[in-house]
Amino acid sequence: MAQSVLQPNTEWTARFAHISWVQRWNSLLQSPLFVVLVSLLTVIGNLFGLELAAYTVLVLLGIGVFLFGRDLLPVMSIVVSCYIMPGVHNNPGRTEESIFYPQNGGIYILILAGLAVACLVYRLVRDQELGGKAFLKRPRKLLPGMLVLGAGYLLSGAFSGRYFENGIYNMAFALVQFLSVFLMYWIFSGTVRWDRVRSDYLAWVGLGAGLTVCCQVIGVYIENQVITEKTIHTGLITTGWGNANNMGCIIAMMIPFAVDLSHRSKYGWVYSTIGVLMIGFTCFTCSRTSIMAAVLIYIVAMLFALRDPRRRKDLIIANSVLLALLVLLLIFHGPMSQLFTELLERGFNPRLRDVIYVDGMQVFRDNPIFGESFYPSVDSIYQFSNVAAMQTILPARWHNTVIQLLASGGVVSLACYAVHRVQTAKLFWKKRKSDGIYISLSVTALLVMSLLDCHFFNDGPVLFYSMALAFLENVKFNK
């Protein structure tokens, strides 16, 4: 359903009302076209090694939003793009030529970030409708649970004797994890005019991010020569911001948004088909957890979509495409089996997960109240993660949210997480009969994958999670 993207001027933007380009700028910002442009910029920066130039443009766009935007909603797509921007050639863990090292561009990136933050602070201080006391007083129903969760993170390892064993890293990691959950929710809840937001805006942000990563999968296959001797070598599926599991996670999370958008356009079958193709790209990440989540979440999203009889034709077309792909898979069973040999050989092999889960529970039994800290002492988890985990400031993680919480923070951390999760579950239930259900499904995909991986303790997916909660809580959706 088409919705107006024009908003009345606020006191802040009234001063620019007579400038025609500012009005056109705001119309662009509130439309899906802006998300498309940001996504294209991210693809170009990632595939062609132009990250520094792309970051510069993204920051300039962000400053344009901070200074001239009616609100800060368009920054959502910029935040996601900044995370998924780095390409293979700039992975700081694989090359010393990465732009993220100070001598190669790291200082410049920090300057860009500082400039963006300064403009954000300026807007919050000067704009009394979105900033100032109004910002602080905006209702944030999920905030209490997030603060409780943050306290649980910061107490992880207290009284275990390991809290400061790695210096301030344990506290710093806990703080970063808390900010990942809290910061975007806190900022956007107070800086967006939610009564004027089009209800499909986050769906466009999510779909843009998902398709961007799909393009990156193609780039990774070419750049890293992933296929040799007609076989996919899964260890080569890595980009500048994450490995195969990270890429698969982002794509799987965004599949519900393709289904959501299918009823908002007369070309709904296009979006439904995109959802099916995103499942295919998830398969080419060879991330087993992501593949499982992508298929399950697509099926559930499709079942919800079938409630609307207007969507059924589009979904029939999309599922016909899926059926055709399955038929082709059967016809070319031999070559496809060879192509995915490594994935098929893994099957349901836990690959040491069963070992580290047992060790994680033993760590919990040894430190039941506050856990051991985010920096494990047992050897098995480093064997699972790889040797590099012992040489980085980032801790090895337990690849299961519950065990991570118990081993790192004990029953206190798990209880704090439960408070936050109960609040989000209530929100999901409240929105279950509206189009907000697709945001709930995206978040559910993240939580399901995090039962076999460490995505809830990776910043990128959780930044989107934080924004999604703000959007879900505040927007009025169609039922």
Map each language-model feature to its residues.
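Transmembrane alpha-helices of multi-pass inner-membrane enzymes
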Residues: 36-39, 256, 420, 436-451, ...
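N-terminal signal-anchor transmembrane segment
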Residues: 3, 7, 23-124, 155-157, ...
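A membrane-periplasm/extracellular boundary helix in multi-pass inner-membrane enzymes
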Residues: 217-220, 284-285, 305-346, 361-365, ...
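Flexible juxtamembrane loops connecting transmembrane helices in multi-pass membrane enzymes
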Residues: 231-238, 329-359, 379-382
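Aromatic-anchored transmembrane helix interface
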Residues: 104-114, 141-153, 165-190, 204
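Alpha-helical transmembrane segments of multi-pass inner-membrane proteins
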Residues: 37-40, 62, 150-154, 158, ...
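Hydrophobic transmembrane alpha-helices and their immediate junctions
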Residues: 311-315, 319, 408-447
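Long extracytoplasmic/lumenal interhelical loops at the membrane interface
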Residues: 346-358, 365-366, 370-409
